[in-house]
Amino acid sequence: MMRIVSIASTAAGRRLAERLPYPVEVGGAAAAIRSAWHKVDAIVVFLAVGATVRLIAPHLQSKQSDPAVIAVDEAGTTAVVVVGGHHGGNQLATEIGALLGASPIITTATDRRDLPALDAIPGFAAEGDYRGVALRMLEG
């Protein structure tokens, strides 16, 4: 089971966050993200994508260790996968979409084309140029 936290800085964000089945941190998003970063598998932030990117940028290390991050707009109309799409973010955005009536915004190329993500196959340890292989898969 994924460890997930919602972070809301405004009353509108808090109202939406409380509709989700995850613990809610209310207040300063920067401090809440810093506190949660190494403790959870996913962070749902009720902020614009640009603000979310600026807040998570100092914490980003690798696809394998960073939590998935979903940015939900304060109207609750979109759930954008910012990072971690292949590591639970895409599924989480879809679940949030169903719970809030929001559109999940998934931009990972393999998911958009129903192809397997080589770096997300359970038990598969990628060696060598797996990105080149993935690119060739996408090119057909």
Where do the model's predicted regions map?
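Short Gly/Thr/Asp-enriched flexible loops that form oxyanion-binding sites at enzyme active sites
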Residues: 55-65
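N-terminal basic/disordered segments at the start of proteins
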Residues: 1-27
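Gly/Ser/Thr-rich loops at beta-strand to alpha-helix junctions
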Residues: 6-14, 47-54, 75-77, 84-90, ...
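Internal alpha/beta core interface subdomains
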Residues: 87-140
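Short, structured active-site "lid" loops
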Residues: 32-53
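General beta-strand structural signal in soluble alpha/beta enzymes
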Residues: 24-28, 44-47, 71-72, 104-108
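Short, acidic/small-residue loops that bind anionic groups at enzyme active sites
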Residues: 63-84, 92-107
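A short, well-structured beta->alpha microelement
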Residues: 21-35, 128-135
